[in-house]
């Protein structure tokens, strides 16, 4: 579902742009790429928050079929059986163990990966990559019912690392953020705001109390951190 607000009046969600039975993740990817194209001549901010991967897991049929063929069924203590999903059954009614290789989850992740690639390619094509901060992250760890966060303990809705430790990838070419480097310094999503302010040379509003701190120096020199 896309909830229409004053901020997205321009988005015509009733128009089918990708043919019959368009897939939501693909549509959001398309809208994001089109947004960049429309705003290429001026500063823009794009926040793309995918619904996937989220239960109930439903991947795009052609990708689900791809992953059905790619892996044999495994053993798992995780529920949410994709065989029940394929049969159109209520996931909550499943009482047996699910195979470990869930093609629906894999398919949903591939759709997100494709969208990230499309956005990065569009920025490159328009010559905007060096002047665009591209951040990839997530809101929480994986749900224990459908995946495993091992070797981290716990998962979504838990304060163990499996619930709160998420990916963070920053792409900002032109020597601003070195490619292929990693950093073990713990940061939190609250740090994004002060970090972006510093990156854009904007002074914080003195009336605001910032929960995070700028990590821009860590982005630029991750090895030192």
Task: Please provide the spans of the model-predicted regions.
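Active-site-proximal cap/lid insertion segments
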Residues: 1-193, 197-213
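Short, intrinsically disordered, charge-balanced linker/junction segments flanking boundaries
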Residues: 214-225
């Amino acid at each position: 579902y896309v909830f229409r607000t004053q901020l997205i009046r321009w988005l015509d969600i009733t128009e089918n742009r990708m043919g019959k039975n368009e897939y939501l993740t693909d549509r959001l990817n398309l809208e994001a790429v089109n947004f960049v194209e429309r705003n290429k001549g001026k500063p823009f901010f794009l926040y793309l928050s995918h619904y996937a991967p989220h239960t109930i897991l439903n991947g795009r049929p052609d990708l689900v079929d791809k992953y059905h063929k790619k892996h044999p069924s495994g053993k798992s203590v995780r529920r949410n059986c994709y065989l029940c999903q394929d049969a159109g059954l209520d996931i909550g009614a499943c009482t047996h163990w699910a195979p470990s290789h869930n093609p629906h989850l894999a398919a949903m992740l591939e759709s997100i990966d494709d969208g990230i690639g499309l956005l990065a390619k569009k920025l490159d094509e328009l010559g905007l990559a060096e002047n665009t901060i591209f951040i990839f992250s997530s809101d929480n760890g994986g749900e224990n019912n459908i995946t495993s966060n091992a070797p981290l303990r716990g998962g979504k809705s838990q304060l163990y690392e499996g619930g709160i430790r998420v990916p963070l990838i920053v792409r900002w070419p032109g020597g601003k953020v070195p490619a292929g480097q990693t950093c073990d310094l713990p940061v939190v999503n609250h740090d994004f705001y002060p970090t972006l302010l510093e990156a854009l040379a904007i002074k914080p509003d003195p009336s605001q109390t910032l929960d995070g701190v700028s990590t821009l120096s860590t982005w630029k020199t991750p090895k030192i951190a």
